[in-house]
Amino acid sequence: MSDPVQPLLDEHAQLQRELADPAVHADAGRARKLGRRYSELNGIVEAHRRVERLSEDLEAARELGSMDPELAAEVKPLEEELAVAREALRRKLVPRDPDDGRNVILEVKAGEGGDESALFAGDLLRMYMRFAEQSGLKTEILSSTPTELGGYKDVQLAVKGSSSDPSEGAWARFKYEGGVHRVQRVPVTESQGRVHTSAAGVLVFPEVDEPDEIDISQNDLKIDVYRSSGPGGQSVNTTDSAVRITHVPTGIVVSMQNEKSQLQNREAAMRVLRARLLAHQQEQIDAENAAARKSQVRTVDRSERIRTYNFPENRIADHRTGYKAYNLDHVLDGALEPVIASAVELDEKARLEQLGQDSAEQGSAGRRG
């Protein structure tokens, strides 16, 4: 069976040569993509070097152990280290989500529950912004529809990363958040002290690096302008600065009203539209590939309830992974890492199982051939 690592080592070396060429950096988009792939392969190269180094040390210890008791004593620890290193390399070989290094557009929408749902949407927004800050990511509110009580009917947030490591990218951290988030608590409007259940929906899209990455024909767009409104629906602008863009072929609609100028709102709306169209393309690919859809937590139905936030018990529970903890106050303050880590672990486990099945099928086919 061919070595699955060698082609990746060759690719890493080739990328290193290309990135050293100043001409490559004249095309910022191409340089960014090459750099992202290079950073992804760095982990595989380092893991492979460690396996090779430990293999050499183990071979030397075995050969010289009969003459040197100290070297003989190193054999078992080296065997254990090598086993761990090989498993780490195997995990690195599991194909990453190619979008991990991308920035994201995150949307939070109030669901059933009226004012309480809108307030919870605001809680989720603050949680995500604090988590992003703690993760070294930058955030920008693109559009929002606030309510009179301080919540949001809907809000769109851009999250941007700066690390060259795809595993630390905005999409790598936020892609598991899409779905229905349920809250159980006593609403501020509840006079009887009864616990109510409401929900908010979260959509997460990888953002397009360059505008021309997604081909959008102007003939496919329907653009409407109107006056922006504030809490309660009252008009807050005397000019038609708000923009609504409809992508006719897909039916995707994006509205923007946060900026004061129509041009700024249009640019922001196109930014979100490109992200949605990129996600739409990926969903079509996933729909044609059942194995890919099954192996990724991020592709669960967005209408699925993924998490419950129980305030009376201070409990957070993720229904996909089984994660449960009684530190809801800390999670809402941005301590979301353990919750997301449980989704990453589940996704990685599924990918490893799929990799094992693929390897077994290839081996069986090779023996038959």
Swiss-Prot record:
Subcellular location, record wording: Cytoplasm
GO CC term, one of those recorded: cytoplasm
Record gene name: prfA
Residues found modified as N5-methylglutamine: 234
Protein family (similarity comment): Belongs to the prokaryotic/mitochondrial release factor family.
Organism: Kocuria rhizophila (strain ATCC 9341 / DSM 348 / NBRC 103217 / DC2201)
Leader peptide range in chain numbering: none
Highest taxon, organism lineage: Bacteria
One MF annotation (Gene Ontology) recorded for this entry: translation release factor activity, codon specific
Function recorded in the entry: Peptide chain release factor 1 directs the termination of translation in response to the peptide chain termination codons UAG and UAA.
Name under which the protein is recorded: Peptide chain release factor 1
NCBIfam families for this protein: prfA (TIGR00019), PRK00591.1 (NF001859)
Pfam families the record matches: PCRF, RF-1
Entry PTM: Methylated by PrmC. Methylation increases the termination efficiency of RF1.
Keyword terms: Cytoplasm, Methylation, Protein biosynthesis
